[in-house]
Amino acid sequence: MDDTEYGRFVDWDKMEGGGQEQSTKVLSCTDFQDLKQMARQGHWAKSHSLRAKVYQKLIKEIPCRTVTPDASVYRDIVGKIVGKRPASSLPLPEFVDDRQIPSYCLNSEGIGAVRKIITCISNQFPDISFCPALPSLVALLLHYSQDEAECFENVSRILACNDPNRRLVDQTFLAFESSCMTFGDLAGKYCQGPHKLMVAVSEDVLEVYSDWQRWIFGELPFAYITRVFDVFLVEGYKVLFRVALALLKFFHKVRGGQPMESNNVKRDIQMFVRDLNQCVAPEKLLEKAFAIRLFSRKEIQLLQMANEKALQQKGITVKQKRQNVHLAVHAENFKSEIVSVKEMRDIWSWIPERFALSQPLLLYTNREHGNSLSRFYLHCEGHEPTLLLIKTTNQEVCGAFLSTDWSERRRSGNKLSFFGTGECFVFRLQPEVERYEWVVIKHPELGKVNASSGDNDANSSQSAKDGIDPSDRLSPFLATRHFNLPSKSASMFMAGSTDCIIIGGGDGQALYFDSDLNYGRTSHCNTFNNQPLCSETFQISIIEVWGFKDNVNNDGAHSALP
């Protein structure tokens, strides 16, 4: 067998065949696209030795901090730190969050070596405060290392990556928790069926999604995690989101029709992933993962930053006992004339996770504040995002999540002009529930069409007026005024004047209200690709606008992204 060089810590009885070394052209490959295709196709998956050499090559190419512990550092410190204690007695650092070490295909020497390496990493990386993926990462790489020191160096390089555009491993609770929120955002957009199931069977859906990294680094069988890691080393963190979304889709497909209890959902998903080889091959998992038309890496990074900012503003930067802050709609303090507590909780599961940390705050209702746009603007300006709810005289219920402060309408003077972001969506609750998101989410090719005309409202020229470098612009998904939005009719989110309010545009309007907020109309529009949300012309019975009250500071206004 050609794998003895990297087989010291491997229990070959557990390993599914070492295989003979394949073509080694990957070791000299410098073209990123070629390397990406090789990784996705499992070019080095059948040879233990080749995979080990590829891992060494890819990890050595990671840009790192100037002072990064290497193999010689490990040899110097391991005796002093571990001493004569048996490896099995070494306590794991708190930052791994009581995560068990997956044994994968390690022999007894390898299992002990993982504890020694983690202990030394804890000594050399005092800035790590939360890294539950570390035990799995060390155990995995040890299969492809000649000795403990080499494994230590490779893990250290991954942890010490200093490329700002290359996120690899979360090392703080803030980064970890914001990743969970980002995964929740992505699940709500790209796995609507599975997400709906999670909302229905769990009291706190983000508590379920907080396990998303564990599904990969901990529960996935060895033959699967290695295929994922092959691609991860080439393409980075976004791959993990893809794979976790694919796992959620497969769980929904296989288990969706079976009864589930809310307190067992996390365990059910863990067991499903652990036994994935019973229903899904590694190739099928990756095929499903890369079939998801996900946001760009830049857009996901911006969403992650927005979630981190929201957590920081609420003081959630270290692990604490979860107080169900993500289930913000409480029966005892929520009262609406339009929706029930359950319906509001369903709506809350659709909104971006960083706002779901907040509690609903009633800003405006026509029953109390009067039927006029001036009163509407008076009570809603200064708040973003907002949730608009409408009940018609025919008892139909619909609404919209609006990402941007209504005061933004003034930036174009008296001209009726669209603004807002790709996080806006419209929905109906009665007679049946349906949500319509930005059309670009399901058809990202529309987002690559730049507006060619000069009349794309205030947004088209604002970045030039503000002197913003186009290379630094935010994504259209999060930006409200820094970005030349894609195809005009696909980016008409919200507009308002003294005469009317429009939500969604392009060959129709998802919602239109007159200046007295008495009558409205709804139709298909290009921005949300929606069906009419209720009767196409309707009379408003009740209209409510809800803001988002910060749980910590009790401040209902959220500032816009910079």
Swiss-Prot record:
Domain TLDc per the UniProt entry, residue ranges: 337-549
GO molecular function, one term: GTPase activator activity
Rab-GAP TBC domain residues: 42-259
GO cellular component: cell projection; cytoplasmic vesicle membrane; plasma membrane; presynapse
Keyword Ribosomal protein: no
Subcellular location: Cell membrane; Cytoplasm; Cytoplasmic vesicle membrane; Presynapse
Residues at which a 1,2-diacyl-sn-glycero-3-phospho-(1D-myo-inositol) binds: 36, 40, 238, 242, 293-297
Membrane-related topology note: Peripheral membrane protein
Region (Disordered): 451-471
UniProt xrefs under InterPro entries: Rab-GAP-TBC_dom (IPR000195), Rab-GAP_TBC_sf (IPR035969), TLDc_dom (IPR006571)
Keywords: Cell membrane, Cell projection, Cytoplasm, Cytoplasmic vesicle, GTPase activation, Membrane, Synapse
Main location: membrane
Keyword 4Fe-4S among UniProt keywords: no
SMART domains named in the record: TBC (SM00164), TLDc (SM00584)
Disulfide bonds: none
Biased composition range(s): Low complexity: 451-464
Domain remark text: The Rab-GAP TBC domain is essential for phosphatidylinositol binding.
Assembly and binders: Interacts with ARF6.
Record's function text: May act as a GTPase-activating protein for Rab family protein(s). Involved in neuronal projections development, probably through a negative modulation of ARF6 function. Involved in the regulation of synaptic vesicle trafficking.
Protein name per Swiss-Prot or TrEMBL: TBC1 domain family member 24
Species name: Xenopus tropicalis
